[in-house]
Amino acid sequence: MRTWKRYAVAALVGAVAVAGACAPPPESDPRTVPVTTTTIPDGYPSTPVGDDQLRLNQLQLIGSHNSYHIAPAPQILDLLANAASVFPQVAAGLGDPATLRYTHATLPQQLARGLRTFELDVYADPDGGRFTQPVLASTIGFQDPLLPSNLGQPGLKVLHIADIDWRTQCATLQECLGQIRGWSDAHPGHLPIVINLELKADGLPDPLIGTPILPFDGPMLDVVDAELRAAVGDRLITPDDVRGSAPDLRTAITTTGWPTVAASRGKILFFMDNSGLRNAYLQGHPSLAGRVMFTSSGEGQPDGAILKENSPGDGSRIAQLVAQGYIVRTRADQDLTPSIDGVRTQADIALASGAQIVHTDFPAGEPAGNGYVVAFGLPVQGRCNPVSTTPATCQQPAVVEP
């Protein structure tokens, strides 16, 4: 079995080698797109009014899923598609390769378009160089011109699937956060930015064998916190900030409440969506005392403040959680279906549910090939939450950016 694993990638490539028979045309570099800013219509309020009464959980923000992602090269996508038919177990482990055919703009470009929430996949790489030679590329002799040059640096890395889907707008967590912090410094009145971190520890599915992936144990979780503090500094919204003098976060959000939008402008909040790492992250830090990230906990837990509901379902559960004071993250689209009507319905439900953080692979400026896109009606960065506010408690001028 061990020998089979060692040669599985080579066998996979040999079985579908026809995919690389024809060289694709040269690709443009999506990392060099100039930043353009969305323009607010004439006559729309330019000064926040009432944001000192509006709470952070009374906003709704749209953002990108896998915010750093650049689609794999055509020959890699073709190889994966053919491999999925030859090795069904590979397809089961990695999913449909067609769902990788999307490229996001750079993070500053997305911010300029109005996105205020992002999702980053993070791998541990304390010594550097762990991801500089993707197995699939090496096996077929593909020299990827978009392989980031800074992958060899020590530190946390940002990419989708090691050895399979490695292209990224920013290869290190410090690079990604540096871009966001730089934009934030230039726009200090922006709405709070919410960043969802998925800490990845899984390698390739059986029978493939690839780059060994390091786990996020207690010391490595401390490294994550240290990198976040180094990059963002005094711009953080931390669990300590929200808890205040309350005994735990759950009590805080149901009594004192979340910070106001006014107090949150120009700041950045991090949420770790790995429920399996929650206990390790809490160890020695009850109710996240001294920690940087909010956790994916369960309803009613002491550290519960932000919850993950990837599928909006019919929207009713999310609406119930929002009414209790939680901030909820959901997805508008979990891969496009053949029917745009079906995926459009899911997006509409996600927005109507009141989930404060709605992630999509197709945000403003990046529609799918069938025209599907998730955006607010006006070119604004956020809106009053449809569940936790009413016209009497929130009007759009409270959530604009000066």
What would you call each of these model-derived segments?
Residues 10-19:
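Bacterial N-terminal signal peptides
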